[in-house]
């Protein structure tokens, strides 16, 4: 199963909220999680905001990126997605999803989840993904 996580889920993972089980997803041998440099750049930009200084320690950030580089598969964006999406900054995620192609886009962003899917690729919440993974266990 090929998966793409949106930035907000990665940030939640670093903060250690209920999405801590994302580590379990990353360690499954039937799951491949894809990232691209643009996604990692967006994560770096978000966590560099002052409000995260006291929430995500530098050591957590360092370990996070080490884990991503160790566990995730990197891809280039080779497709320019066109979609009626409110936040055009998210278009690169849809382009990346098409480029791989992934089986699922997983996001906590209502703008994306309300789309329901993009070019046959379902856009799920994290809880929906976990339900699918439990069915496949």
Tell me the role of every PLM-derived stretch.
Residues 70-105, 110:
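Active-site neighborhoods of divalent-metal-dependent phosphate/nucleic-acid chemistry enzymes
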Residues 25, 96, 115:
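Hydrophobic/aromatic ligand-binding patch that stacks against planar heteroaromatic rings
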Residues 12-13, 46, 55, 115, ...:
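Residues that scaffold the ATP/ADP-binding catalytic core of kinase and kinase-like folds
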Residues 17, 34, 59, 84, ...:
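Residues at secondary-structure transition points
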Residues 6-7, 35-36, 108-109, 125:
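A secondary-structure boundary/capping signal
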Residues 1-35:
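Short, well-structured N-terminal submotif of metal-dependent ribonuclease cores
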Residues 26-80:
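PIN-domain endoribonuclease scaffold, especially VapC-family toxins
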Residues 100-106, 110-137:
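Acidic, PIN/NYN-like endoribonuclease modules and their adjacent C-terminal/linker elements
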